[in-house]
């Protein structure tokens, strides 16, 4: 039941991870330190699920490095991808439009109220001081928004009136600001009167004397999204204010319009009316169709010309004040627009950090923890950042099918807690990392499976050995897109080649144009995979074929790209020879094992601040170029190939040499066969004189047939050797004839005199065996005749092996015994001369054979 529960829980988690609405994950980042101390990094691929984001502040992604908040936040796109946003300089012009984005906005509290210097203050101090104060006020307006404080009197009214005038420029007004002291005093008096009337009007409407300005300011360049909770009461009060000021027919929607570009603007619905409208009609907000854009709203103006006086004098004063202020604000607005056009800021999106930005993160050598948080911790994604030195080689390993025994079952069985990894893989990779190599785990899984993949690699333990830590590089695509590329299209090498080339460019930025794989500089030392696509990916980035290992489902490791693919091994056997395949990395040219750091290739202190570029002169380059791979036991000790443009002359010379060799071999074969036939005839003459009877006739016939066959062979060779016809015989026929006559060219050569002795000995042994077999047959027949008995009787003194079975009668009758003895004696007398004659004949015959078969010393010496 435990396995069932684990399986159900894992399936539910996997199904939820496949859902695009909840898919989240981040890919590990690699930072490479160069000899001059410069840092370069791989992309920050961070993906969140499709959360329901209502506020622009929720798009801000906080980045924590080693549990410390960094000062470089990221922004979340609508698709769930996070990216950095940086301001571009004026010198950057050729940037695609799709990379231009709005800045990162966050929920910030409203700016605190602070007293500001009005342009109307200090009027008696002279014109120069007034101009300085005017510039100071303009700078304040551009930097931060201004807010209306109802409790302020006097100066605040002039400030608000200045803001109101700046928002409603008129085209017809061309008056200049007051320069004399009298004009300034007149403007100041009118401002005070306007402020008093405005405060009296707001008090009658029962607007609160103090508004809550502690709400969040939610502004984004992509659009204005107000806070509904804070703006609800204000909308009601604004409607009541418009009703009291402009009548019952006034609607807030009539003041807000949208232009063709989608910008929201405030317009004057009564612009067709004149300024001298009768009392009771809404006053003129702006003339000549003046509009207010979103920039004006963000500048902080929240109030327009809302006052309306029942008396004519007040209306005249207010009208003159509005004209003066509108002319002043028109001049100021033109200056501000020109200045803003020159200093317009543009923001670009990116997923990489520069050298200066990386140095601000306070990184350490080896492994660093990354955490990405959205909306104050509602969604958190974690990953790792590895800082590596430029001179430490990398060993790549696939995960599915390379660490696991199969692609599919590696996912399924790992969910229920069953170990489905190859034996010895943890021990081998641990030894490789101990020798000073960096381990890189590469897989075509999607970024949403990053957490599950890392947890699986950390859980592998075999006989006390675990896999070493290393970056897990996954596909930045979603799960369905990654599965389609790997399962349906069966092209995982498309992602792997692009990813490895990107990592390689971190080490060698100036070698991107190298096309030849043999000449390509690469930081990768070896690669492990389970398919031919993995081998092709590793070979594309410059890994030699002799260091690309492919493992099958049975645990056999072989080198698939080598021409001699008969090499078979395993992780356990490679672990025994790990120092041969992966020699220890030397960090110092004097001492090879002086490094005491736990991080491969890093100094013991593990800090980036203590880097000294002068020590790189004494360091030795650890990357083995592909040129060194040409001088191995497999490649270097081969016979060099002849570099000749035209091979036709060589083919003709080879054909002539073959013909000459054929002629020589034919002549040698003829002479050898002739000598063998002569010696065979000499050997067969000796038994021909002494053999009698039928046996002698057979031997004579056999000897004569051998001589005839030998003579025929000699004649055939002599005829073929005397008149060789090269024109009618092809090269194939010549080679076949050489093979039939000389044997296989791979066989060991034999000396001619040894062949002659072998032939002579074989003929002699053959003749001797025939003679011995015929003599033995004759003697056996005679022995059987000699020992045969016709009648059975009592046992006698002469006992033979054949007569033992007949000695079964009793010995009771002496007469019978005497008779039997007499008959036996008579029979013995009759047979004895005959047997003696046979023995003499046999001895003489054997002696003759021995005399005939003796070696002739003269013949042997010849």
Curated annotation (Swiss-Prot):
Principal place of residence: cytoplasm
Composition bias, Low complexity: 161-179, 300-313, 710-730
Biased composition (Acidic residues): 651-663, 849-862
Posttranslational mods: Acetylation at Lys-496 and Lys-801 by ESA1 promotes synthesis of diacylglycerol. Phosphorylated by CDC28 at the onset of mitosis, and dephosphorylated by the NEM1-SPO7 complex. Phosphorylation regulates recruitment on promoters of lipid biosynthetic enzymes.
Compartments (UniProt record): Cytoplasm; Nucleus membrane; Endoplasmic reticulum membrane
PTM sites of type Phosphoserine: 110, 114, 168, 511, 602, 744, 748, 773-774, 810, 814, 844, 847
Reactions the enzyme catalyzes: a 1,2-diacyl-sn-glycero-3-phosphate + H2O = a 1,2-diacyl-sn-glycerol + phosphate
Swiss-Prot/TrEMBL keywords: Acetylation, Cytoplasm, Endoplasmic reticulum, Hydrolase, Lipid biosynthesis, Lipid metabolism, Membrane, Nucleus, Phosphoprotein, Transcription, Transcription regulation
GO molecular function terms attached to this record: phosphatidate phosphatase activity; transcription cis-regulatory region binding
GO biological process: aerobic respiration; diacylglycerol biosynthetic process; fatty acid catabolic process; lipid droplet organization; phospholipid biosynthetic process; plasmid maintenance; triglyceride biosynthetic process; vacuole fusion, non-autophagic
Membrane topology: Peripheral membrane protein
Domain notes: The N-terminal amphipathic helix (residues 1 to 18) is involved in the membrane recruitment. Contains one Asp-Xaa-Asp-Xaa-Thr (DXDXT) motif, a catalytic motif essential for phosphatidate phosphatase activity.
Protein name: Phosphatidic acid phosphohydrolase 1
Annotated source species: Saccharomyces cerevisiae (strain ATCC 204508 / S288c) (Baker's yeast)
Gene: PAH1
């Amino acid at each position: 039941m435990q396995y069932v529960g684990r399986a159900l829980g894992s399936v539910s988690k996997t199904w939820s991870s496949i859902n695009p609405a909840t898919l989240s994950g981040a890919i590990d980042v690699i930072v490479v330190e160069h000899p001059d101390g410069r840092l370069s990094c791989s992309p920050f691929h961070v993906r969140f699920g499709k959360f329901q984001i209502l506020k622009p502040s929720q798009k801000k992604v906080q980045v924590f490095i080693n549990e410390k908040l960094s000062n470089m936040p990221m922004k979340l796109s609508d698709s769930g991808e996070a990216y950095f946003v940086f301001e571009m300089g004026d010198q950057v012009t050729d940037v695609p439009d799709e990379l231009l984005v709005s800045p990162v906005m966050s929920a910030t509290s409203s700016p605190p109220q602070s007293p500001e210097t009005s342009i109307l203050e200090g009027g008696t101090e002279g014109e120069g001081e007034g101009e300085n104060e005017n510039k100071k006020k303009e700078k304040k307006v551009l930097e931060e928004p201004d807010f209306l404080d109802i409790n302020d009197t006097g100066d605040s009214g002039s400030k608000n009136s200045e803001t109101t005038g700046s928002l409603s420029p008129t085209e017809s007004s061309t008056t200049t600001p007051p320069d004399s002291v009298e004009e300034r005093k007149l403007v100041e008096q009118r401002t005070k009167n306007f402020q008093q009337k405005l405060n009296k009007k707001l008090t009658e409407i029962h607007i609160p004397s103090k508004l809550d300005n502690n709400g969040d300011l939610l502004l984004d360049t992509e659009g204005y999204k107000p806070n509904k909770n804070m703006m609800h009461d204000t909308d009601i009060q604004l409607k009541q204010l418009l009703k009291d000021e402009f009548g019952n027919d006034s609607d807030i929607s009539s003041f807000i319009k949208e232009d063709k570009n989608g910008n929201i603007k405030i317009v004057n619905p009564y612009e067709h009316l004149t300024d001298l409208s009768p009392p009771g009609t809404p006053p003129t907000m702006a003339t000549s169709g003046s509009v207010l854009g979103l920039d004006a709203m963000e500048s902080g103006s929240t109030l327009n010309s809302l006052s309306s006086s029942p008396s004519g004098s007040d209306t005249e004063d207010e009208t003159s004040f509005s004209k003066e202020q509108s002319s002043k604000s028109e001049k100021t607005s033109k200056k501000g627009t020109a200045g803003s056009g020159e200093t317009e800021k543009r923001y670009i999106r990116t997923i990489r950090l520069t050298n200066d930005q990386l140095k601000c993160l306070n990184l350490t050598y080896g492994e660093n923890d990354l955490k990405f948080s959205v909306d104050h911790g509602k969604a958190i994604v974690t990953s790792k950042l590895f800082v590596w030195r430029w001179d430490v080689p990398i060993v790549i390993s696939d995960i599915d099918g390379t660490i696991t025994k199969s692609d599919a079952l590696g996912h399924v069985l790992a969910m229920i807690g069953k170990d489905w990894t190859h034996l010895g893989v943890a021990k081998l990779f641990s030894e490789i990392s101990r020798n000073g190599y960096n381990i890189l785990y590469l897989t075509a899984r999607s970024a949403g499976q990053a957490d599950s993949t890392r947890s699986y690699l950390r859980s592998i333990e075999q006989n006390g050995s675990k896999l070493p830590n290393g970056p897990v590089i996954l596909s930045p695509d979603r799960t369905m897109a990654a599965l389609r590329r790997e399962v349906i299209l069966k092209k995982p090498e498309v992602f792997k080649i692009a990813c490895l080339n990107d990592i390689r460019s971190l080490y060698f930025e100036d070698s991107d144009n190298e096309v030849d794989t043999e000449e390509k500089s690469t930081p990768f030392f070896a690669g492990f995979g389970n398919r031919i696509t993995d081998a092709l990916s590793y070979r594309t980035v410059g890994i030699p074929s002799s260091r690309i290992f492919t493992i099958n489902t049975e645990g056999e490791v072989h080198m698939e790209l080598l021409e001699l693919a008969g090499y078979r091994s395993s992780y356990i056997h490679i672990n025994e020879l790990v120092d041969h395949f992966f020699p220890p990395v030397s960090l110092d040219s004097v001492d090879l094992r002086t490094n005491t750091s736990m991080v491969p290739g890093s100094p013991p202190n593990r800090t980036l601040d203590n880097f000294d570029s002068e020590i790189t002169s004494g360091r030795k380059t650890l990357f083995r170029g592909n040129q060194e791979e040409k001088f191995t036991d497999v490649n270097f000790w081969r016979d060099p190939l002849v570099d000749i443009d035209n091979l036709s002359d060589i083919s003709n010379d080879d054909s002539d040499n073959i013909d000459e060799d054929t002629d020589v071999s034919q002549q040698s074969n003829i002479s050898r066969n002739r000598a063998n036939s002569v010696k065979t005839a000499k050997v067969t003459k000796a038994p021909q004189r002494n053999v009698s009877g039928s046996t002698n006739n057979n031997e004579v016939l056999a000897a004569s047939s051998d001589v005839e066959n030998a003579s025929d062979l000699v004649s055939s060779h002599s005829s073929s050797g005397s008149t060789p016809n090269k024109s009618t015989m092809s090269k194939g026929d010549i080679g076949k004839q050489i093979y039939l006559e000389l044997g296989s060219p791979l066989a060991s050569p034999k000396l001619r005199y040894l062949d002659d002795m072998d032939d002579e000995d074989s003929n002699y042994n053959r003749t001797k065996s025939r003679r011995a077999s015929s003599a033995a047959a004759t003697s056996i027949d005679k022995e059987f005749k000699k020992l045969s008995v016709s009648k059975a009787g009592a046992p006698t003194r002469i006992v033979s092996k054949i007569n033992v079975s007949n000695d079964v009668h009793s010995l009771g009758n002496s007469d019978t015994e005497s008779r039997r003895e007499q008959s036996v004696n008579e029979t013995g007398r009759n047979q004895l001369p005959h047997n003696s004659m046979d023995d003499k004949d046999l001895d003489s015959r054997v002696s003759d054979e021995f005399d005939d078969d003796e070696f002739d010393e003269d013949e042997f010496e010849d």
